[in-house]
Amino acid sequence: MSRSDHSLSIAAPHSGTLDGSQKIALAVASMGVLVLFVSLPMGTVPHAGLWLTGALLAIALGGAGYAWRTYAHHPAGIKNNGVWHNGLTSRGAVAWVLGVLLTGFYVVLYFYPQYLGLGGDGKANTGTVALFDPLSRLLSGNAASQWFVYGTLYTVAILSMGFKFILKYRHNKYEVVRTTSVMFFQLGFAFLIPELLARLSLPYDDFKNMWPLNYYFFDEWNVKGMLDAGGFGLFMLLFGVAMIFLISPILTYFYGKRWYCSWVCGCGGLAETAGDPFRQLSDKSLKAWKIERWAVHSVLVFAVVMTAALVYSYLGGDSAKGFWVTRGMLLGIIVLTLGFVVAVLLIRPGMVKEVHKAVRYGAMGILAVIIGLTAYAYISGGSDIFFVQSYPLRNAYGFAIGAIFSGVVGVGFYPLLGSRVWCRFGCPMAAVLGLQQRFFSRFRITTNGGQCISCGNCSTYCEMGIDVRSYAQRGESIVRASCVGCGICAAVCPRGVLKLENGKPSGLVSSDPIAIGRTGATLR
């Protein structure tokens, strides 16, 4: 006998009830999670490899089965019906419970790994960490750490939720290819390759994770480790530098920051897959936008200052310390970089006019202070640029930004603040790519304002908090530093108003003189 439907909605939103297949799939996934929890208080885990294999397969297959039953048997098309009536996706009780659990997990992961079973002082692992020992020894030859546990679960989450995302957006080729790319880079470059490098006694390195997101790349121990690894280590060092100063700017020029934030980055990969149900929770207010601009660029300044101070502290006055770069050469690199920025601004003065006066003066003041303190430290022969020891500064950055902001808040607050909190307010890599995209990239989202019906879907589902509808209503192209080019705004638009395109960089800053909007054509 069929279940009666008491809803009078024409849209037929999800009623919240599950069919038998969905219940079985969720039960299977829950059993996998239960194995992880049960292993917590255990000393040694018998048959750990068998239990771990069963748990991970249960989580992955259960999640995939639920997604298949939810989306595969319905016509292709995006269905976000009832998201504001679901406790999980509208900051309800379930969302708050999940947020607390995620936040608590990250606190334990970063600061109390012993409660997960991490063995210290040469002791063997116990509990959940011991459960992952067989897989870790298979890949790297070493016992598991809390970071291996986290990386494994992180990868499983992106793969299983990525499969769900592909089913949901299967009619959109751009979303399918983009999500497949994220899944590939997470599994291959972020998980498997670094573990295999460790097995070969080579430095552990995620090739796609570049500075300033990888804030320890220029740490002395990391640089020495790569230099001591021979030719391959030298390749890793040069490739990392090329990613920062050559590969990233070129790709951003042609494709915008989406090439990294939506196609490659692991943080963005988790936000796009596991965080997809929460994208509508991003704050679109003007106040949030102002906080975003100051916060993310302040973190970038902090990262640059911290890195410069750290590198300067371990470089010698000559090459006797084993590095190719001396303090004098570092000072020259800083001066040349700033000179290049000034030259670009002189060539394209229109960019400066688009920046608020307070920001311009603040940036010039910070640059002057950095140059002055660096020159003073070099002339006086001191080892600390900013009159503070560099490693405590580095540790403060790692604690506040690398742990609290990116992990505890960035992922723990998914169900409450949306999936891109870290990307919007704290990621220094997003800040660098955003500046390049805003002023030097060919990428933009074009609008056909005459077709806009002001439904607001684009703004609602923008995970970066951009009020896309306001641009569409005025017929303006969207060129925002924060846009990650996920394409969801174009995908949810019922009228085909938005389109991801490339154009001439000269037309990015200044608006078109003629705007075609909802009220007709107007002259600016």
Regions inferred by a protein language model and the residue ranges of each:
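Non-ligating segments of multi-cofactor redox enzymes
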Residues: 1-476, 481, 495-524
